[in-house]
Protein backbone atom coordinates (compact mmCIF):
# COMPACT_ATOMS: atom_id res chain seq x y z
CA UNK A 1 0.00 0.00 0.00
CA UNK A 2 1.71 3.18 -1.19
CA UNK A 3 1.68 6.61 0.42
CA UNK A 4 -0.03 9.49 -1.33
CA UNK A 5 1.17 12.09 1.19
CA UNK A 6 3.13 14.20 -1.31
CA UNK A 7 -0.07 14.68 -3.32
CA UNK A 8 -2.37 15.28 -0.36
CA UNK A 9 -2.62 19.03 -0.94
CA UNK A 10 -2.53 19.76 2.79
CA UNK A 11 0.37 22.21 2.69
CA UNK A 12 2.95 19.75 4.00
CA UNK A 13 4.64 18.82 0.71
CA UNK A 14 8.01 20.18 1.87
CA UNK A 15 7.78 18.20 5.10
CA UNK A 16 6.83 14.99 3.29
CA UNK A 17 9.70 15.39 0.83
CA UNK A 18 12.17 15.94 3.65
CA UNK A 19 10.99 12.74 5.36
CA UNK A 20 11.76 10.80 2.17
CA UNK A 21 15.12 12.53 1.81
CA UNK A 22 16.18 11.67 5.37
CA UNK A 23 15.10 8.01 5.26
CA UNK A 24 18.64 6.61 5.45
CA UNK A 25 19.55 8.65 8.53
CA UNK A 26 16.27 7.68 10.19
CA UNK A 27 17.05 3.99 9.70
CA UNK A 28 20.50 4.60 11.20
CA UNK A 29 18.86 6.20 14.25
CA UNK A 30 16.63 3.16 14.70
CA UNK A 31 19.66 0.91 14.27
CA UNK A 32 21.36 2.63 17.22
CA UNK A 33 18.26 2.17 19.37
CA UNK A 34 17.85 -1.53 18.53
CA UNK A 35 21.45 -2.17 19.63
CA UNK A 36 20.52 -1.41 23.24
CA UNK A 37 18.86 -4.52 24.79
CA UNK A 38 16.51 -2.55 27.05
CA UNK A 39 14.65 -5.58 28.43
CA UNK A 40 12.75 -4.39 31.51
CA UNK A 41 11.74 -7.90 32.62
CA UNK A 42 15.33 -8.94 33.43
CA UNK A 43 17.15 -7.43 36.39
CA UNK A 44 20.48 -8.07 34.69
CA UNK A 45 19.34 -5.84 31.80
CA UNK A 46 18.21 -2.94 33.96
CA UNK A 47 21.43 -1.03 33.28
CA UNK A 48 20.65 -1.27 29.56
CA UNK A 49 17.17 0.15 30.15
CA UNK A 50 18.75 3.13 31.92
CA UNK A 51 21.21 3.44 29.03
CA UNK A 52 18.27 3.52 26.63
CA UNK A 53 16.64 6.35 28.57
CA UNK A 54 19.85 8.39 28.39
CA UNK A 55 20.18 7.71 24.66
CA UNK A 56 16.64 8.92 23.99
CA UNK A 57 17.12 11.99 26.19
CA UNK A 58 20.29 12.85 24.27
CA UNK A 59 18.56 12.49 20.89
CA UNK A 60 15.70 14.68 22.08
CA UNK A 61 18.00 17.41 23.40
CA UNK A 62 19.84 17.56 20.07
CA UNK A 63 16.50 18.42 18.47
CA UNK A 64 15.82 21.20 20.95
CA UNK A 65 13.40 19.29 23.16
CA UNK A 66 13.43 20.29 26.84
CA UNK A 67 14.05 17.02 28.68
CA UNK A 68 13.58 15.88 32.27
CA UNK A 69 14.34 12.39 33.58
CA UNK A 70 11.85 11.72 36.36
CA UNK A 71 13.02 9.07 38.87
CA UNK A 72 10.36 6.52 39.83
CA UNK A 73 12.08 4.96 42.85
CA UNK A 74 12.44 1.27 43.63
CA UNK A 75 10.58 -1.56 41.92
CA UNK A 76 7.66 -2.69 44.05
CA UNK A 77 8.23 -6.44 43.73
CA UNK A 78 12.05 -6.13 43.77
CA UNK A 79 12.94 -3.41 46.30
CA UNK A 80 16.67 -3.62 45.55
CA UNK A 81 16.06 -2.74 41.90
CA UNK A 82 15.80 0.86 40.71
CA UNK A 83 13.04 1.68 38.24
CA UNK A 84 14.11 3.31 34.97
CA UNK A 85 13.05 6.96 34.73
CA UNK A 86 10.22 8.55 32.84
CA UNK A 87 11.68 10.53 29.97
CA UNK A 88 9.60 13.72 29.94
CA UNK A 89 10.01 16.21 27.13
CA UNK A 90 8.56 19.51 25.97
CA UNK A 91 8.75 20.99 22.48
CA UNK A 92 6.98 24.30 21.93
CA UNK A 93 5.06 26.76 24.13
CA UNK A 94 2.89 28.49 21.53
CA UNK A 95 -0.53 29.41 22.95
CA UNK A 96 -1.86 29.56 19.38
CA UNK A 97 -1.31 25.81 18.99
CA UNK A 98 -2.82 22.76 20.69
CA UNK A 99 -0.64 20.78 23.08
CA UNK A 100 -0.48 17.04 22.40
CA UNK A 101 0.84 14.58 24.97
CA UNK A 102 2.63 11.73 23.21
CA UNK A 103 3.10 8.46 25.11
CA UNK A 104 5.45 5.65 24.12
CA UNK A 105 7.86 3.22 25.78
CA UNK A 106 11.55 2.49 25.30
CA UNK A 107 11.75 -0.94 26.93
CA UNK A 108 11.25 -4.15 24.96
CA UNK A 109 10.38 -7.81 25.32
CA UNK A 110 13.21 -10.35 25.82
CA UNK A 111 14.87 -11.74 22.69
CA UNK A 112 17.72 -14.13 21.87
CA UNK A 113 19.02 -15.67 18.65
CA UNK A 114 18.55 -19.16 20.10
CA UNK A 115 14.82 -18.47 20.47
CA UNK A 116 14.52 -18.94 16.71
CA UNK A 117 15.26 -15.48 15.34
CA UNK A 118 16.50 -15.38 11.75
CA UNK A 119 18.96 -12.64 12.72
CA UNK A 120 20.54 -11.24 15.85
CA UNK A 121 17.56 -9.44 17.46
CA UNK A 122 19.85 -6.63 18.67
CA UNK A 123 21.18 -5.84 15.20
CA UNK A 124 18.79 -4.11 12.80
CA UNK A 125 18.56 -6.17 9.62
CA UNK A 126 16.96 -4.89 6.43
CA UNK A 127 15.40 -7.73 4.45
CA UNK A 128 15.20 -7.76 0.65
CA UNK A 129 11.54 -6.74 0.77
CA UNK A 130 12.43 -3.67 2.82
CA UNK A 131 11.16 -4.94 6.16
CA UNK A 132 13.22 -3.97 9.19
CA UNK A 133 13.92 -6.88 11.54
CA UNK A 134 15.03 -6.39 15.14
CA UNK A 135 13.59 -6.26 18.63
CA UNK A 136 11.71 -3.02 19.18
CA UNK A 137 11.35 -1.99 15.54
CA UNK A 138 7.56 -2.18 15.85
CA UNK A 139 7.09 -2.21 19.64
CA UNK A 140 7.89 0.43 20.53
CA UNK A 141 11.24 1.96 19.65
CA UNK A 142 10.29 2.42 16.01
CA UNK A 143 7.07 4.37 16.69
CA UNK A 144 8.80 6.36 19.47
CA UNK A 145 11.74 7.39 17.30
CA UNK A 146 9.28 8.31 14.56
CA UNK A 147 8.26 11.33 16.65
CA UNK A 148 11.88 12.51 16.84
CA UNK A 149 12.26 11.96 13.11
CA UNK A 150 9.13 14.04 12.58
CA UNK A 151 10.57 16.99 14.51
CA UNK A 152 13.83 16.78 12.55
CA UNK A 153 11.93 16.67 9.25
CA UNK A 154 9.92 19.77 10.11
CA UNK A 155 13.08 21.59 11.21
CA UNK A 156 15.06 20.75 8.08
CA UNK A 157 12.08 21.55 5.85
CA UNK A 158 11.90 24.99 7.47
CA UNK A 159 8.33 24.37 8.65
CA UNK A 160 7.01 24.89 12.18
CA UNK A 161 5.76 21.84 14.03
CA UNK A 162 1.96 22.43 13.98
CA UNK A 163 1.43 21.65 17.67
CA UNK A 164 3.19 21.86 21.01
CA UNK A 165 4.42 18.45 22.08
CA UNK A 166 4.73 16.95 25.54
CA UNK A 167 6.48 13.58 25.64
CA UNK A 168 6.04 10.82 28.21
CA UNK A 169 8.30 7.85 27.48
CA UNK A 170 8.47 5.03 30.03
CA UNK A 171 10.86 2.12 30.49
CA UNK A 172 8.64 -0.45 32.22
CA UNK A 173 5.67 -0.90 29.89
CA UNK A 174 6.62 -4.51 29.13
CA UNK A 175 6.93 -5.29 32.84
CA UNK A 176 3.92 -3.87 34.66
CA UNK A 177 4.46 -0.09 34.26
CA UNK A 178 5.54 0.13 37.88
CA UNK A 179 5.43 3.70 39.17
CA UNK A 180 3.77 5.19 36.12
CA UNK A 181 0.28 5.86 37.48
CA UNK A 182 1.71 7.53 40.59
CA UNK A 183 3.93 9.70 38.39
CA UNK A 184 0.92 10.73 36.29
CA UNK A 185 -0.95 11.75 39.42
CA UNK A 186 2.06 13.76 40.59
CA UNK A 187 2.50 15.54 37.26
CA UNK A 188 -1.18 16.03 36.33
CA UNK A 189 -1.13 19.61 37.61
CA UNK A 190 2.54 20.19 36.85
CA UNK A 191 4.26 18.88 33.73
CA UNK A 192 0.98 17.78 32.10
CA UNK A 193 -1.23 20.62 33.31
CA UNK A 194 -1.79 22.38 29.96
CA UNK A 195 -2.17 19.45 27.56
CA UNK A 196 -5.24 19.30 25.32
CA UNK A 197 -5.21 15.67 24.16
CA UNK A 198 -3.22 12.43 24.39
CA UNK A 199 -1.84 10.31 21.53
CA UNK A 200 -0.67 6.70 21.99
CA UNK A 201 0.95 4.87 19.06
CA UNK A 202 1.43 1.47 20.73
CA UNK A 203 -1.30 -0.14 18.57
CA UNK A 204 -1.61 -1.75 15.11
CA UNK A 205 -4.08 -1.81 12.22
CA UNK A 206 -6.83 -4.40 12.28
CA UNK A 207 -5.07 -6.14 9.37
CA UNK A 208 -2.21 -5.64 6.94
CA UNK A 209 -4.79 -4.72 4.31
CA UNK A 210 -7.30 -2.70 6.35
CA UNK A 211 -6.23 0.61 7.87
CA UNK A 212 -8.01 1.28 11.13
CA UNK A 213 -8.10 3.45 14.21
CA UNK A 214 -9.16 1.65 17.41
CA UNK A 215 -11.33 3.48 19.90
CA UNK A 216 -11.62 0.66 22.41
CA UNK A 217 -9.42 -1.81 24.28
CA UNK A 218 -10.19 -4.84 26.40
CA UNK A 219 -9.24 -4.80 30.06
CA UNK A 220 -7.12 -7.45 31.76
CA UNK A 221 -7.16 -9.33 35.05
CA UNK A 222 -4.02 -11.41 35.66
CA UNK A 223 -3.89 -14.27 38.17
CA UNK A 224 -1.24 -16.29 39.97
CA UNK A 225 -2.64 -19.58 41.25
CA UNK A 226 -0.31 -21.25 43.76
CA UNK A 227 -0.71 -24.82 45.01
CA UNK A 228 1.68 -26.08 47.69
CA UNK A 229 2.06 -29.70 48.75
CA UNK A 230 5.48 -30.02 50.39
CA UNK A 231 8.60 -28.15 51.45
CA UNK A 232 10.74 -29.57 48.63
CA UNK A 233 10.42 -31.65 45.47
CA UNK A 234 10.12 -35.43 45.86
CA UNK A 235 11.14 -38.44 43.75
CA UNK A 236 8.10 -39.90 41.99
CA UNK A 237 9.52 -43.42 42.28
CA UNK A 238 9.84 -43.18 46.02
CA UNK A 239 6.77 -41.09 46.82
CA UNK A 240 4.34 -41.34 43.88
CA UNK A 241 0.94 -42.48 45.17
CA UNK A 242 2.02 -41.79 48.75
CA UNK A 243 1.90 -37.98 48.91
CA UNK A 244 -0.53 -35.35 47.68
CA UNK A 245 0.70 -33.92 44.37
CA UNK A 246 0.14 -30.23 43.45
CA UNK A 247 0.24 -30.91 39.70
CA UNK A 248 -2.89 -33.07 39.84
CA UNK A 249 -4.84 -30.26 41.49
CA UNK A 250 -3.37 -27.61 39.23
CA UNK A 251 -4.32 -29.44 36.04
CA UNK A 252 -7.83 -30.06 37.38
CA UNK A 253 -8.40 -26.41 38.24
CA UNK A 254 -6.77 -24.84 35.19
CA UNK A 255 -8.69 -27.11 32.82
CA UNK A 256 -11.97 -26.20 34.53
CA UNK A 257 -11.64 -22.49 33.72
CA UNK A 258 -12.12 -22.56 29.94
CA UNK A 259 -13.07 -25.18 27.36
CA UNK A 260 -11.33 -26.05 24.10
CA UNK A 261 -13.63 -23.73 22.14
CA UNK A 262 -12.68 -20.69 24.20
CA UNK A 263 -15.83 -20.57 26.34
CA UNK A 264 -15.14 -19.37 29.88
CA UNK A 265 -16.63 -21.85 32.37
CA UNK A 266 -16.83 -19.53 35.39
CA UNK A 267 -20.58 -19.04 36.08
CA UNK A 268 -21.90 -15.49 35.68
CA UNK A 269 -18.95 -14.11 33.76
CA UNK A 270 -20.97 -13.28 30.63
CA UNK A 271 -23.93 -11.71 32.47
CA UNK A 272 -23.05 -8.05 31.79
CA UNK A 273 -21.47 -8.45 28.34
CA UNK A 274 -23.11 -6.32 25.63
CA UNK A 275 -24.81 -8.19 22.81
CA UNK A 276 -23.64 -7.67 19.23
CA UNK A 277 -26.07 -6.00 16.84
CA UNK A 278 -26.89 -7.32 13.38
CA UNK A 279 -25.34 -4.19 11.87
CA UNK A 280 -22.09 -4.75 13.76
CA UNK A 281 -21.93 -8.38 12.67
CA UNK A 282 -22.43 -7.48 9.02
CA UNK A 283 -19.88 -4.66 9.15
CA UNK A 284 -17.23 -6.97 10.64
CA UNK A 285 -17.65 -9.45 7.80
CA UNK A 286 -17.10 -6.66 5.25
CA UNK A 287 -13.70 -5.62 6.59
CA UNK A 288 -10.74 -6.34 4.31
CA UNK A 289 -8.77 -8.85 6.38
CA UNK A 290 -6.82 -11.82 5.06
CA UNK A 291 -6.80 -15.04 7.06
CA UNK A 292 -3.10 -14.54 7.81
CA UNK A 293 -3.73 -11.04 9.18
CA UNK A 294 -6.76 -12.21 11.12
CA UNK A 295 -4.53 -14.70 12.91
CA UNK A 296 -1.68 -12.20 13.24
CA UNK A 297 0.68 -14.29 11.14
CA UNK A 298 0.85 -16.92 13.90
CA UNK A 299 -0.22 -19.89 11.80
CA UNK A 300 -2.74 -20.74 14.53
CA UNK A 301 -6.02 -22.62 14.08
CA UNK A 302 -9.10 -20.42 14.31
CA UNK A 303 -12.00 -21.32 16.57
CA UNK A 304 -14.48 -19.48 14.35
CA UNK A 305 -15.99 -20.08 10.92
CA UNK A 306 -16.57 -16.45 9.95
CA UNK A 307 -14.48 -13.31 10.13
CA UNK A 308 -17.22 -11.57 12.11
CA UNK A 309 -17.28 -14.28 14.77
CA UNK A 310 -13.49 -14.11 15.08
CA UNK A 311 -13.51 -10.33 15.50
CA UNK A 312 -16.40 -10.45 17.96
CA UNK A 313 -14.42 -12.94 20.04
CA UNK A 314 -11.46 -10.53 20.02
CA UNK A 315 -13.25 -7.21 20.46
CA UNK A 316 -16.68 -7.74 22.00
CA UNK A 317 -16.40 -10.79 24.24
CA UNK A 318 -14.23 -11.66 27.23
CA UNK A 319 -11.60 -14.38 26.93
CA UNK A 320 -9.62 -16.49 29.38
CA UNK A 321 -6.12 -17.66 28.47
CA UNK A 322 -4.00 -20.21 30.33
CA UNK A 323 -0.39 -19.06 30.11
CA UNK A 324 1.79 -21.55 31.94
CA UNK A 325 2.37 -23.74 34.98
CA UNK A 326 5.70 -23.13 36.66
CA UNK A 327 7.61 -25.11 39.24
CA UNK A 328 8.12 -22.61 42.05
CA UNK A 329 11.38 -24.26 43.11
CA UNK A 330 14.24 -22.81 41.02
CA UNK A 331 16.36 -25.46 39.35
CA UNK A 332 14.02 -28.24 40.43
CA UNK A 333 15.36 -31.76 39.94
CA UNK A 334 14.74 -34.42 37.32
CA UNK A 335 11.72 -34.39 35.04
CA UNK A 336 10.23 -37.28 36.99
CA UNK A 337 10.21 -35.39 40.28
CA UNK A 338 7.03 -34.37 42.08
CA UNK A 339 7.01 -30.56 42.42
CA UNK A 340 6.52 -29.26 45.94
CA UNK A 341 4.87 -26.05 44.77
CA UNK A 342 3.40 -24.87 41.48
CA UNK A 343 2.31 -21.50 40.18
CA UNK A 344 -0.33 -21.41 37.45
CA UNK A 345 -0.71 -18.22 35.43
CA UNK A 346 -3.84 -17.17 33.58
CA UNK A 347 -5.60 -13.97 32.58
CA UNK A 348 -9.04 -12.74 31.62
CA UNK A 349 -9.64 -10.02 29.03
CA UNK A 350 -12.70 -7.94 29.88
CA UNK A 351 -15.05 -5.88 27.69
CA UNK A 352 -17.47 -2.95 28.26
CA UNK A 353 -19.88 -3.26 31.19
CA UNK A 354 -17.71 -5.86 32.96
CA UNK A 355 -16.35 -4.69 36.32
CA UNK A 356 -13.00 -6.13 37.37
CA UNK A 357 -13.93 -6.33 41.05
CA UNK A 358 -17.10 -8.30 40.29
CA UNK A 359 -15.29 -10.66 37.91
CA UNK A 360 -12.56 -11.25 40.48
CA UNK A 361 -15.16 -12.28 43.08
CA UNK A 362 -16.71 -14.76 40.63
CA UNK A 363 -13.31 -16.25 39.74
CA UNK A 364 -12.11 -16.54 43.34
CA UNK A 365 -15.37 -18.17 44.45
CA UNK A 366 -15.36 -20.63 41.55
CA UNK A 367 -11.74 -21.73 42.04
CA UNK A 368 -12.10 -22.16 45.80
CA UNK A 369 -15.25 -24.23 45.39
CA UNK A 370 -13.57 -26.32 42.70
CA UNK A 371 -10.53 -26.90 44.91
CA UNK A 372 -12.77 -27.85 47.83
CA UNK A 373 -14.59 -30.41 45.66
CA UNK A 374 -11.27 -32.14 44.90
CA UNK A 375 -10.81 -33.08 48.55
CA UNK A 376 -7.15 -32.17 48.24
CA UNK A 377 -4.69 -32.06 51.13
CA UNK A 378 -2.65 -29.35 49.40
CA UNK A 379 -2.78 -25.61 50.07
CA UNK A 380 -4.29 -23.12 47.62
CA UNK A 381 -3.55 -19.43 47.18
CA UNK A 382 -5.17 -17.17 44.56
CA UNK A 383 -3.51 -13.85 43.82
CA UNK A 384 -5.08 -11.29 41.50
CA UNK A 385 -1.68 -9.85 40.59
CA UNK A 386 -2.80 -7.14 38.18
CA UNK A 387 -5.98 -5.67 36.78
CA UNK A 388 -6.97 -2.87 34.45
CA UNK A 389 -10.45 -2.05 33.19
CA UNK A 390 -11.51 -1.83 29.56
CA UNK A 391 -11.17 1.44 27.66
CA UNK A 392 -13.49 3.17 25.21
CA UNK A 393 -13.10 6.65 23.72
CA UNK A 394 -15.30 9.02 21.70
CA UNK A 395 -14.28 9.25 18.04
CA UNK A 396 -16.34 12.44 17.60
CA UNK A 397 -13.63 14.45 19.37
CA UNK A 398 -11.34 16.57 17.15
CA UNK A 399 -8.41 14.42 18.30
CA UNK A 400 -9.82 11.35 16.52
CA UNK A 401 -11.13 13.36 13.59
CA UNK A 402 -7.62 14.75 13.04
CA UNK A 403 -6.21 11.21 12.95
CA UNK A 404 -8.89 10.07 10.50
CA UNK A 405 -8.15 12.97 8.14
CA UNK A 406 -4.38 12.45 8.48
CA UNK A 407 -4.78 8.79 7.50
CA UNK A 408 -6.68 9.90 4.42
CA UNK A 409 -3.94 12.43 3.63
CA UNK A 410 -1.04 9.98 3.93
CA UNK A 411 -2.56 6.70 2.77
CA UNK A 412 -5.41 7.89 0.57
CA UNK A 413 -8.01 5.69 2.26
CA UNK A 414 -10.62 6.08 4.98
CA UNK A 415 -9.67 4.15 8.14
CA UNK A 416 -12.35 2.09 9.87
CA UNK A 417 -13.04 2.59 13.55
CA UNK A 418 -12.48 -0.63 15.47
CA UNK A 419 -11.57 -2.02 18.87
CA UNK A 420 -8.44 -3.87 20.01
CA UNK A 421 -8.37 -7.22 21.74
CA UNK A 422 -5.31 -6.29 23.75
CA UNK A 423 -5.00 -4.08 26.81
CA UNK A 424 -3.09 -0.83 27.31
CA UNK A 425 -3.71 0.12 30.96
CA UNK A 426 -1.95 3.46 30.50
CA UNK A 427 -4.70 4.58 28.09
CA UNK A 428 -7.29 4.35 30.85
CA UNK A 429 -4.87 5.96 33.34
CA UNK A 430 -4.39 8.97 31.08
CA UNK A 431 -8.15 9.29 30.55
CA UNK A 432 -9.00 9.02 34.25
CA UNK A 433 -6.17 11.14 35.66
CA UNK A 434 -5.79 13.85 33.02
CA UNK A 435 -9.45 13.91 31.92
CA UNK A 436 -8.49 14.33 28.27
CA UNK A 437 -9.42 12.54 25.05
CA UNK A 438 -6.98 9.68 24.37
CA UNK A 439 -6.25 8.75 20.76
CA UNK A 440 -4.94 5.31 19.77
CA UNK A 441 -3.02 5.90 16.52
CA UNK A 442 -1.76 2.75 14.74
CA UNK A 443 1.42 2.82 12.68
CA UNK A 444 2.10 -0.92 12.48
CA UNK A 445 0.58 -4.13 11.19
CA UNK A 446 -0.66 -7.19 13.12
CA UNK A 447 1.85 -9.46 11.36
CA UNK A 448 4.81 -7.39 12.62
CA UNK A 449 5.23 -9.86 15.50
CA UNK A 450 5.65 -7.21 18.18
CA UNK A 451 6.12 -9.71 21.05
CA UNK A 452 7.32 -12.73 19.10
CA UNK A 453 10.50 -13.89 17.42
CA UNK A 454 11.56 -12.00 14.29
CA UNK A 455 9.75 -8.83 15.39
CA UNK A 456 9.85 -6.41 12.50
CA UNK A 457 8.49 -3.25 10.96
CA UNK A 458 7.56 -2.60 7.36
CA UNK A 459 10.02 -0.10 5.89
CA UNK A 460 7.46 2.02 4.00
CA UNK A 461 5.19 1.93 7.07
CA UNK A 462 7.99 3.35 9.21
CA UNK A 463 8.48 6.29 6.85
CA UNK A 464 4.76 6.87 6.42
CA UNK A 465 4.36 6.82 10.20
CA UNK A 466 6.52 9.95 10.35
CA UNK A 467 4.34 11.59 7.70
CA UNK A 468 1.22 10.48 9.56
CA UNK A 469 2.44 12.10 12.79
CA UNK A 470 3.06 15.39 10.99
CA UNK A 471 -0.27 15.36 9.17
CA UNK A 472 -2.09 14.44 12.39
CA UNK A 473 -0.62 17.46 14.18
CA UNK A 474 -1.50 19.69 11.21
CA UNK A 475 -5.12 18.51 11.23
CA UNK A 476 -5.25 18.71 15.03
CA UNK A 477 -4.21 22.36 14.87
CA UNK A 478 -6.99 23.16 12.38
CA UNK A 479 -9.72 21.34 14.29
CA UNK A 480 -8.55 22.64 17.68
CA UNK A 481 -8.81 26.20 16.42
CA UNK A 482 -12.25 25.51 14.99
CA UNK A 483 -13.42 24.02 18.29
CA UNK A 484 -12.16 27.06 20.18
CA UNK A 485 -13.94 29.38 17.75
CA UNK A 486 -17.28 27.61 18.11
CA UNK A 487 -16.99 26.97 21.85
Each model region followed by its residue ranges:
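Metal-dependent amide/peptide-bond hydrolase catalytic core
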Residues: 2-11, 206-208, 222-465, 470, ...
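Acidic/His- and Gly-rich active-site-bordering loop/insert found
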Residues: 2-137, 156-161, 346
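Beta-strand segments within the central parallel beta-sheet cores of soluble alpha/beta enzyme folds
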Residues: 70, 162-170, 197-199, 266-271, ...
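Short, solvent-exposed loop/turn segments at the edges of secondary structure
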Residues: 84, 119, 162, 194, ...
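Acidic, glycine-rich active-site loops and adjacent beta-strand->loop/helix elements
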Residues: 106-108, 168-177, 201-205, 229-231, ...
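Acidic-glycine-rich active-site phosphate/pyrophosphate-binding loop
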Residues: 114-127, 218-229, 405
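Acidic/histidine-rich catalytic neighborhood of metal-dependent amide-processing enzymes
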Residues: 131, 136-216, 481
Amino acid sequence: MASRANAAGDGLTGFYSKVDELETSFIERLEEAVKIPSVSAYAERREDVFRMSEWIASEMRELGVEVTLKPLGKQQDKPDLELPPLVLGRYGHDIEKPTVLVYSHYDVQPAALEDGWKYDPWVLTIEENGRLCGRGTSDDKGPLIGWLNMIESFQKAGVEVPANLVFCFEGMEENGSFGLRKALEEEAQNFFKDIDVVCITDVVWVSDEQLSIPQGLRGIIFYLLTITGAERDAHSGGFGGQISEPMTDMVNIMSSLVDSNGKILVPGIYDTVQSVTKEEYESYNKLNISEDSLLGGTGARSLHKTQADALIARWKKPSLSLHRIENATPGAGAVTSIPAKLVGKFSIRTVPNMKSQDIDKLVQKYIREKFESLGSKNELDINCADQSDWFYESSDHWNYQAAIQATQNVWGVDPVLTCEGGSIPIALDFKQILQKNVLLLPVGRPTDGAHTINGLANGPNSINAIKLYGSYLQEAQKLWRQSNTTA
